[in-house]
Design a protein with these regions (language model features):
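Dual-mode signal for accessory low-complexity, basic/Gly-rich regions
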Residues: 2-127
Length: 127
């Protein structure tokens, strides 16, 4: 994909000296990809399926983040063992630059209509 614009609300625009692009998003959506979650998992040789977050933080100025995560280890396209008490760390700009694939399974029970996402190069610790 190509980033065409940023979501910048009034507060952030004033703080950064930029022009406001939105008021506040009420429903965030993303164009669906071709694979469901099982298809995304099958395409991964070694990785981690994050199913939940256990606290953490993100610096809104730098984009640096650290979140506790839980989920499953993926090996050779299959879920292997459950994981917990791990951390995912990085930078939001780098994370979104490394978005590799988008699923076709958005959750409809949330104001964020975002499908499963596959990222490359995420740093995890604690396994």
């Amino acid at each position: 994909g190509i980033l065409k614009t940023y979501y910048i609300d009034t507060y952030s625009a004033n703080k950064m000296g930029m022009e406001q692009t939105i008021g506040s998003p009420s429903i965030l959506t993303m164009r669906n990809g071709d694979k469901d979650l099982d298809g995304l998992i099958a395409s991964i040789d070694k990785g981690i399926l994050v199913t939940g977050f256990n606290g953490g933080n993100c610096n809104s100025t730098t984009g640096d983040f650290s979140y506790g995560v839980e989920g499953f280890l993926i090996e050779r396209g299959k879920l292997s063992q459950p994981i917990s008490e791990m951390n995912a760390t990085g930078n939001m700009l780098s994370l979104w630059s490394n978005l590799a694939e988008v699923g076709n399974d958005p959750r409809l029970s949330s104001s964020w209509r975002i499908p499963s996402l596959l990222f490359n190069g995420v740093d995890f610790s604690g396994l």
